[in-house]
Amino acid sequence: MVEQDGATAAGEAPEPIRAHRADYLPVLLVPALAVAALPLIGNPVTWLTLTIAALAMGMMIFVIASGLTLVFGLMDVLNFGHGAFIAIGAYLAMTTLIPLAGWIQADQLALNLAALGLAILVAMAGTSIIGWAFERVIIMPVYGQHLKQILVTTGGLIVAEQLIHVFWGGEQKPMPLPTALRGAITIGDVAVEKYRLLTMAVGLAVFVAMLLVLNRTKLGLLIRAGVENREMVEALGYRIRRLFVAVFVAGSALAGLGGTLWALYRETLTAGIGSEVIVLVFIVTIIGGLGSIGGCFLGSVLVAQMANYTGYLAPKVALASNILLMVIILMWRPQGLYAVTGR
């Protein structure tokens, strides 16, 4: 019996993971929502512009939320401090870009991308290190204690925001967008911002990379097995503690990447940037299903669609509309679009 379970944990996908691969019904929600929005918006060009903007926004949210959903699913940790990594990553990227003003303002795409790539590398490296320390000092003592997790991680977020005020000041900062990524490409009557195309490419690349790691590597199989049954993985002799740390650090790095993309999208930066986006990130995590990368990806697109469509039609209810979306989906599927765990 142990050998059979071991094969499931380390060499074969758990049954719920295999089962949801063939479930394409939730995917239909994306085109259904888009079609439903068209008559309300009226103008097809405006509708298409909003839809493209939603895809770009969805990719940024996915990058941020993907790490958090694995932390939720594998570690069973309610990390409200995830917003701290979003903000710190964005500020580290800004600090890196400012001395590279010559590269950013150059007309050469290679220099622009080199500056952006270096800023992203610094942001991800910095948030990885901070994430490791955060897990050791704040998360580890409260494993299995959800109320304490909420309190201490929220406290960590507040402390991080205050430290940002100390090191970078409390005023709003400009986030320099490279010259080559400014402006838009016109396709027919639709203007598509260049930067949005980049964010879509980055988001898709992260999604594909995570799928490959989770489905084609031993580490990925262990992570998926840990999401499904942590006790069985430990019984097989694997050190789930190390897996916890690796996943938390990776999630922190992705938050740093997502924070950088989000700040560049806004072209401004404040200490509260993490708090501003973390609500949408948690909605995505809950909608998608704890531990499900596919569900997180789909949930990110749905949330971004709802935010963009309602933001155009009725800006005051944009956030409320996403909460309503979450309620409707949970009434339909209480464990999320693609439930991986039974928790």
Identify the function of each model-found stretch:
Residues M1-I64, L92, I104-L118, Q145-I150, ...:
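Membrane-interfacial amphipathic/re-entrant helices at transmembrane-helix boundaries
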Residues M1-A36, K148, V152, F167, ...:
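Cytosolic-side transmembrane-helix boundaries in multi-pass membrane proteins
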Residues D5-G6, P99-W103, G170-G183, S300:
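Peri-membrane helix termini and adjoining interfacial loops of integral membrane proteins
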Residues G67, L111-N112, L116-M124, V245-A255, ...:
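Transmembrane alpha-helical segments in multi-pass inner-membrane proteins
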Residues W47-I98, A133-L147, F282-I293:
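Single transmembrane alpha-helix segments in multi-pass membrane proteins
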Residues A191-L269, I293-L298:
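Helix-loop-helix "hairpin" substructures at the membrane interface of multi-pass membrane proteins
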Residues W103-G156, L163, L298-V303, R333-P334:
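Alpha-helical transmembrane segments within multi-pass membrane transporters and channels
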Residues V137, P141-R216, L243-A246, E267, ...:
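Transmembrane helix-bundle core of multi-pass membrane transporters
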